[in-house]
Amino acid sequence: MKYIAYSKFCPEDMEKVVKKFGEYKKEHEENPGKYQEYLFPPHFTGQTKGFSIVEGTPEQINNVLIFWTPLIKFKYIPIRKAAKYFEQYMKSK
């Protein structure tokens, strides 16, 4: 499933997050399939807030949350194709 993944962390944790990001990048490369895939990589929308567009299973997303907790808080919003929704809607009538 595809998601918009919003993230935020405390400004005081910036150096910890930068260090852990290097660890995450290496871990992600060494363990394909363990973590979500990035369709649109992380981007900042503010000082310590950001978003990315990802695709993953619940298990892959759990692995991301486990890796980053408690440094970064995430909120995942599912993305659905409008055409499929409209098709299903029309069938329900």
List where the protein language model places each region.
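A common structural microfeature
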Residues: 49-51, 73
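C-terminal structural segments of small proteins and small subunits
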Residues: 63-88
